[in-house]
Every structure is written in C-alpha cells, then in structure tokens.
C-alpha cells in the first residue's frame, strides 16, 4: 500500500501569509464592553506582537477584530530560510497554538488589572479562547491587495459593531454602512468618522531594523517592534506602507545610509 504525505509545502522565496482567527469569538466575547472592548483589543495587539517576535521571517502583522494577519518573507538575505521549511500544516498549527496560549495568558493579566468586575467577562477568561490558522502564498504584487481587503473588512466590522451597540437588529436591517453612519450621527450624536483610527481600521505591528557598526567595522542589526495605531489606508500612496516590507533589498540600502549618517 502506498502512503502519501499530506503535509504540503508552500513555495519558497515567495511571501507567506499566516491568517490567525479567533474561533467562536461571538460567544467568547459575550458580555464584553461594546462596541470596542479595550482589554480585548489590547490582548489582540499584544498577541500579534508576540507572534511577530517569535515567528521566523515575520516582518509585519495587521490585526482587526479577532483576526491577525502575519506577513512572512524568506528572501530578505541569501541565507534566509523559511519557518518550518514552509510546511503548511506546521505553520498553521503552531501559529494557532502560539496565539491561543499567549492570548489566554495576556488577556487574564490585562483583564484582572484594568477591567471592572463582570460575571460574563470572568466566565470567558475561565473558559479561554481558541484560535485557528491557515497559511498560504501570495505573489508580491498581490500582498498589498490582500491587506487592503482585510482593512476594508475591518472598516465594515467597525461600522456594524458601532451600530449594533446603539441600535436594535431590526433598526439596522437592510441598512448600508453609510446609512448606519448617518443614523449614529443624527440620532445618537456619535460621529463614526471621528473615532480613533485603530477603532476604524485596525492596527499594525511594524518592524524597525537598526544598524550599527562595531569598532572592528562589523555591521550588526537589531529588530524592534512597535504598534502603529494610526495606519493609512492601504491604497494609493498608502500601498507603500506594506510594499516596503516586500522588497527588502531596496529598503535595506536606505536603512544602511541612515545608520551611517547617524
């Protein structure tokens, strides 16, 4: 009998997306603050940062709602190798496990420190959250389109969640997003367009590479990660926000110049 491996490999030297999603989060978040629970949002950001720091080849994360999208490249240097040899099953299962374990740790820490007593909230923390993940290749020219698609989804989610916090489902039935924005402003005096950017369209965890030189002339680089709460729209000029991570050869020369000038 012939047995075949089902552990497929992604294409090397091609961008990889790992998409991490919360499972049944509509149940997990029941009783949380609406429309934007600060503890939940902080836990998602911290989890995204943790994944960035611990997943080989990760250069960017975009998180919105219960979703984290990670961008991995394995061509930054000639000797760069892919995480777990780009084995699809391994990438997805380990990313999901890492997200699940860390999220459940950090949300308890944040929640117990900052959140007011809430029976539903405590029950959710006791049960814990669970994440699933998938991994796939995208051509370089399609990566920004993917992140723009997820950002548009974030905007729709934000408008819908804000509407649901102030109106009944029957009041929102068959209402387009623009109509919901108008209802919020006219009936509740809430201007969705003036919400903080991260509440409208999510946040990114971005990497900065710092170069320095030792006395012997050797150049060393260190990575730092930070949260961008004021991300642009990933269209037009905003496309470069993503694309600069897809073409490291072009941006690395600029980083070296900056380091030398400093």
Model-derived features with residue positions:
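Regulatory and interdomain segments flanking nucleotide-handling catalytic cores
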Residues: 1-262
